[in-house]
Amino acid sequence: MSEDYIVRAMAADNQIRAFAITSRNIVETARQHHNTSPVATAALGRLLTGGAMMGVMMKGDNDILTLMMKGDGPINGVTVTADSHGNVKGYVGNPNVIIPANYAGKLDVGAAIGYGTLTVIKDMGLKEPYSSQVPLGTSEVAEDLTYYFATSEQVPSAVALGVLMEKNNTVKQAGGFIVQLMPFAEEEVISALEEKIAKITSVTDMLEKGMTPEDILEFVLGDLGVEITDKVPTQFYCNCSKERVTKALMGINKAEIKDMINEGKDIEVNCHFCNTNYNFSVEELKTLRKKY
């Protein structure tokens, strides 16, 4: 299976910056971890794909990006976290959501998420993380990220994200691109870009034709002198461990741990991001209580 990766590029004498990704493995790994329905896979897959690219836009080694789409739809929210090294993870509130296809016969991600808000949090090691919230427009993910870039970061952007499913509900293709205009972009560059982007029907169609992220950016920006500047491997990666979960348990007050011990039953702690369960025996809980 070919590896997932992100390419960065500049075009039109640095008036445009762009990112493109192939993310089939990321989305399939997420599907396997969470056992998501097709529409939940599409929703989570799109946000993971966008989040991975937005993560590598950050400069600091320890920077962390969190994207949260909270709507009134039955999926009960989608959350994704990414770092600046191409690692991304995420989950949905209701992985089993099943809703009818939309008018075009496609998975109805917008209806699954519903009306609500997109929250973007960037933790760059400062005292307070940067946080911004915008209303969801279509709730189809790509348009909502486009709106976020325009309103919160004042960067005109084109975002395209896609997940294509196999008949057996595994992931066939996933990927996307983000193309952004720099503040000094000239009018003719903007027009040429808008014209080209209007011709693009679907990212997954491009991937199905065997196009790589490089090919996609060449197609979108080829007439504008595109130059690939970097290639970054990307993966679904969760950094949870028993040790980290133990630290989280230590944050619970002692009385609660005592109640758990008195019940005399082992407890199970679940990591939302990768759906891994960590078991703690009564003996382990007693040791924890003594230690802290």
Positions of PLM-derived features:
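Interaction interfaces in information-processing and related assembly proteins
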Residues: 1-230
